[in-house]
Amino acid sequence: MAEAKMIEYHPMNDLKTSSLEYHSRKPAGKLQIKITKPIRSVDDLSLAYTPGVAEPCLEISKDVKKAYQYTNKNNLVAVVSNGSAVLGLGDIGALASKPVMEGKAVLFKHFAGVDAVDIEIDEKNPVKLANIIEAISPSFGGINLEDIKAPACFVVGEILKKKLSIPVFHDDQHGTAVIVSAGLLNALEIVNKKIEEVKVVMTGAGAAGIAIAKLITALGVKKSNLFMFDSKGLITANREVNKYKAEFAQPPHQSPVCQE
C-alpha cells in the first residue's frame, strides 16, 4: 500500500481547506480493515472461512467467553453515536457525525492499540437507541457512547449498564468527569484546602456537568456546596428541571456564591 502523503498544517493555513483535503484523500475517511491472519493458500481460506471456521463457532456456542479467545472481541470497541450533541456542532444527525466517530476510533487505535468501529445510529428515542446498542453488543468487548444529547444519554447509559456484561463508557460524561475531578483534587492539594469545605460553582448541566457533579460529590464535595447553573441560571428546587438536574438543586432564593 502506498505511503499516505503528509499534509503540513500551519495555524495560518485555511483549516477548512486542509481538513476537507485530509478527509477526502483516497482512501476517503480515516479507517480501514486489516486482515490479521495469512491468506496465502486454499488451506488458509478453508481455515478463515468454511469449513474450518465452524470449529471456533462450535466452541463459542458451548462457552460464550471463548469469543475472546477466537475472535477480535477481546480488542474491539464500538464508538456509538446518534449525532444529537456533537461538540461545537450540536444536533447534526447520525451520518454527519461519522467523521467525528471515525476520529475517536483513530484515537483508540493510535494511542492505545485498541481496534474501534464507528457506528452511527439514526435514532433519537433513548430506549430504542439503547435496545439497538444492546442488540449489536455481542460483537464488541466494550461500548463507547459519544455525542448523545442529555438527558437521553443518561437513559441510554442506565439501560445498558443493567443489561450488558461488557464495559459501557460515555466519554462526554465519564471521561470529562475523571479529568475535571483530577484537576480539582490537585488544585485543592496546592491550596491546602479540604474537599468537604470548598464551594464549587459549575456552569453547565448537560452530560458532562451532571457526570462531574456525581463524581466530585462522591469524592467528598457536599451537595449543599455545589451550585450548578444551566442556561436559565442556578438550578433550584422550585424550578422545573429533569431528575438528573434536580439531584443537585439548591433551596430557592439561594445566592451562596456571595456568602462566606
Region locations from a protein language model:
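Residues at the C-termini of beta-strands that transition into short coil/loop
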Residues: 120-122, 172, 230
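N-terminal ligand-binding/catalytic initiation module
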Residues: 2-168
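Accessible peptide chain termini
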Residues: 1-2, 260
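Glycine-rich phosphate/diphosphate-binding loop of Rossmann-like nucleotide-binding domains
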Residues: 87, 94-112, 164, 170, ...
